Amino acid sequence: MNLILLMVIGFLIFIGTYMILSVNLIRIVIGISIYTHAGNLIIMSMGNYSKNKVEPLIGEGSQNFVDPLLQAIVLTAIVIGFAMTAFLLVLVYRTYRVTKEDEIDVLRGDDDDANE
């Protein structure tokens, strides 16, 4: 199971890197969002079931459990990732409305303007 999860995380990182390296701003935002999902999966994979972990307050008849701290961290990361994605989408939309362009190469401008 861990090997499958590791392969999924690697695939998400590959797709995120591919999207971030494109010139389209929307693809870059989607790539950053995919990176956050891969990071959340990495954190969740750290809290897998273990035979040595037992419920802390119940002595007899206890069962294996997953660390709730990692789940709280991932929930917080999901909210932060959603807010960041929403902010970046608004920023890209505003940039498109002002410049009528959505590619990074066009938005860089001319080097002659920077020298003057």
Curated annotation (Swiss-Prot):
- Give the family this protein belongs to, as stated in its UniProt record: Belongs to the CPA3 antiporters (TC 2.A.63) subunit C family.
User: How would you summarize the oligomeric state and partners of this protein?
Assistant: May form a heterooligomeric complex that consists of seven subunits: mnhA2, mnhB2, mnhC2, mnhD2, mnhE2, mnhF2 and mnhG2.
Keywords, sorted A to Z: Antiport, Cell membrane, Ion transport, Membrane, Transmembrane, Transmembrane helix, Transport
Species for this entry: Staphylococcus saprophyticus subsp. saprophyticus (strain ATCC 15305 / DSM 20229 / NCIMB 8711 / NCTC 7292 / S-41)
Q: What is its main location?
A: membrane
Determine if Cytoplasm is one of this entry's keywords.
no
Q: Which gene encodes it?
A: mnhC2
Q: What is this protein called?
A: Putative antiporter subunit mnhC2
What's a GO cellular component annotated to this UniProt protein?
plasma membrane
Its membrane topology is listed as: Multi-pass membrane protein
One biological process GO term for this chain? monoatomic ion transport
Check the record and name the InterPro entries matching this protein: CPA3_antiporter_subunitC, NUOK/Mnh_C1-like
One GO molecular-function annotation for this sequence? antiporter activity
Q: Where are the transmembrane segments?
A: 3-23, 28-48, 72-92
